[in-house]
């Protein structure tokens, strides 16, 4: 809206005054009038605001102009006062562009003025400071400023050129160059200065020539008496010329006098002095020369005295004492004294080192500073000391190595030596070489003698005492050879006697055991009959005494074999837990009789299947545990097995067994005696507890043979702990369903009652049982199992003792063997195991081999009981030459209802086999006419010849019977084709178990043979039989060649068997093993 335009009412309407004066119009137009007035008032108010804004804007513009004018005035005043540092401030927002332009122009002017002033000031300052050549820079200035700058630069340039020219000439004059003059253009006073300087240079050149001529003649050429001739000189130059000439004259007189004195001094005449009249410094020179002459006299006297003392009289340590000398003379004096001091130190150091060398001390060297020939002498002496030290070191080393340490063949390595030292070194090396040859020759002969070769003698050359020693050694060898021959004859006689002793013991054993076996057998049979109490007691005493005597005989035979070094150990596969468990089961009855707890614990982490001698391990455990039971009245006997902490080879394991008891203990002073032969802790113990004292001695020797050691800790009255270690190897044996021990039980049932194992663990165990050819039935509680027909279990596996107790309350499974399997089996109480019928145990998780090792003993004990039915009658052939043993065996067998035919030697047994068919043969090893081994070989050959395709059909089990306990009889009997082994005295239960097992196993194999014959079994049997050639061959090999290992019999009734499959043939193998492999193939 335009503020000058006034609001008006519509032309058709009345005016405001009309409306206000007319009430009627007022009432009609009141509202519109009010609106019109409001619009008018608002318009006026807007006009007022606009005017006020314009007024304020004008005031601000005036104020800004005044401020800018003030700032410009301040800058102008500063310029007038010579201050060019200030500028007009330019604000961020400038209201007037013209003012802004003025400010920029003024500031630019200030910059140019400041630059001009700085440049001109710089040039003026440089010229004032003597720095010529400077110029003022002109950066775009014009007008008067540019002209002023150019004039200043011209002035500076001219002044620079003139001053530099003058400076060059004066500098040349100062340096003695009088050939240059000033030739630069100059005007005014500068020109006058130029001419004056050039004139001065000419005069100086003439003066210098004349003065130089005089100086050269007098001072250089030594031509005295010359004068300087200079013309046209005045003032100072003339005076200077006169003074020079006077100086030359005086100098001539004085110098000639001084020359006379110095010439006399040079000729060694120190009596003359300078006498010319002198002044000033020449006088000082005169006095100095005269003083020099005096000092030279003193110096010559002192040096002469020192030289005579050091050089002639050999008195070291002297010094030249010259007073009041300075400069070169003082230096000469000091040098002379230094020479005397150095010479003294050097000679004394050389004397010290040579004295030390003379006294044998080669560690010192000349370390004093020296030069020239003295240095060469020093180096020569030090080199001599080094050579002597090397010589002494090498010679001492040879002497010490050869003479003290006994190191032969050493030579002194000394280089760079000549003369006597080289000769001595050569002599020492010759001595060492000769001594080496002689001693090594002596050593070779003594070494040969040590190795048993007494045919060689010392032939090396020697002299003196070495020759006497050589003779003595040769004589000693000769004497030793004779002694050895005598000792050899004596040893052979001793070995013959020892062999006779061993054979005597064997024969004695046989002769004693034969009637003793009869006594034991007959008393056992009598004890099984109706007897009175008195008769039973008497026969029991006889039976016990006979068994004790038999044990003593076995111990004596064992210690005899050990002493004769004929005792060896086997390396066969065996089950550790089964071996120890079986041994402790045989001792459990004795422990129960004495009301003792017999416990057993084996480290679950230790492997079960090992390679070693299980029979000897069992023997040691029986011995130690039996002793513990014997010497313990109350408490318990514990056997623990773990891995030893001692280090062995990587391929070996060290087994540690501890047998502890709460018995009588052993006194500390007796601990070292108990392992000696025929010794116990004291004699009273022998009388109270019985025994021969051989058990621990035999155990110690057996443990040593098995690579271990035995020790004991004991507290008297509280008990003992016997520890021993045995070195074994882990076994790689693999059980399958075709393994010999498992073949007879193929597809038999196994019940597993588990409350501790998870389902996953049970699945693994089920697969293992199936892999062994058995049928598992796994239940979580006894109620889920079918305990009646048609399922018939051979063994029952359990994982807790509580389950075993419940099973023994059930009549259906009361006599079935139990196998305990658990993650971590605590100590086993053998009383509980016997009462519950636990046959074996295993730790889980376990391998197939560990599982088979636990199952097989239970299966075999179950099969024996199943095959011991009295309704079964066997036809048995007994080959025995002793009448008592015949009657004993016949009574035992007939009592079981079996039919027995008796023959007296092996030949009769062979003929009987050819005539009749027998279920089993009991073959005595030693018989007249033909022994048991020879008879067995002939029987096996006849069986093979009778049916070369399938000799197994005609195979008759043969069980060896012997009272001979010497080493190798068992192995030999098995290797000859016998199926099992029974040691006398005959125990009815063990004998019947062995008979039943052999007959059962051979019947099972014959059945498998018949079932497999349709698959070309006979051809494969013939082809795979070792030694066979063709089906029609006369020597096609025997079934014995396919025989493996038969379990070794326990020597105590009730011990059971510990059968193991053997995967390699050796001298100890000889039973049914590979037949199963032939059937499988």
Swiss-Prot record:
SUPFAM superfamilies: ATPase domain of HSP90 chaperone/DNA topoisomerase II/histidine kinase (SSF55874), CheY-like (SSF52172), HAMP domain-like (SSF158472), Homodimeric domain of signal transducing histidine kinase (SSF47384), Methyl-accepting chemotaxis protein (MCP) signaling domain (SSF58104). The modification Phosphohistidine is found at residue 510. It catalyses: ATP + protein L-histidine = ADP + protein N-phospho-L-histidine. Induction: Expression is increased in opaque cells. Its EC number is 2.7.13.3. Residues 1010-1081 are annotated as: Disordered. GO terms for molecular function: ATP binding; phosphorelay response regulator activity; phosphorelay sensor kinase activity; protein histidine kinase activity. The phosphorelay mechanism involves the sequential transfer of a phosphate group from His-510 (H1) in the histidine kinase domain (transmitter domain) to Asp-924 (D1) of the response regulatory domain (receiver domain). This transfer probably occurs between two NIK1 molecules, rather than intramolecularly. It is found in: Cytoplasm. Residues 63-118, 157-209, 249-301, 341-393, 433-485 form the HAMP domain. Disruption phenotype: Impairs the hyphal formation and attenuates the virulence in a mouse systemic candidiasis model. Residues 875-999 form the Response regulatory domain. Residues 507-730 form the Histidine kinase domain. The modification 4-aspartylphosphate is found at residue 924. GO terms for cellular component: cytoplasm; membrane. Keywords: ATP-binding, Cell wall biogenesis/degradation, Cytoplasm, Kinase, Nucleotide-binding, Phosphoprotein, Repeat, Transferase, Two-component regulatory system, Virulence. It is an enzyme of class 2 (transferase). Residues 1023-1032, 1068-1081 have a biased composition (Polar residues). GO terms for biological process: cell wall organization; cellular hyperosmotic response; cellular response to farnesol; filamentous growth; filamentous growth of a population of unicellular organisms in response to biotic stimulus; filamentous growth of a population of unicellular organisms in response to starvation; osmosensory signaling via phosphorelay pathway; positive regulation of filamentous growth of a population of unicellular organisms in response to biotic stimulus. The HAMP domains are critical for the sensitivity to fungicides such as fludioxonil, as well as for activation of HOG1. Histidine kinase involved in a two-component signaling pathway that regulates cell wall mannan biosynthesis. Required for hyphal formation and virulence. Plays a role in fungicides sensitivity, probably through the positive regulation of the HOG1-signaling pathway. Presumed to mediate phosphotransfer to the HOG1 MAP kinase pathway during oxidative and perhaps osmotic stress. This is Histidine protein kinase NIK1. It comes from Candida albicans (strain SC5314 / ATCC MYA-2876) (Yeast). The gene is NIK1.
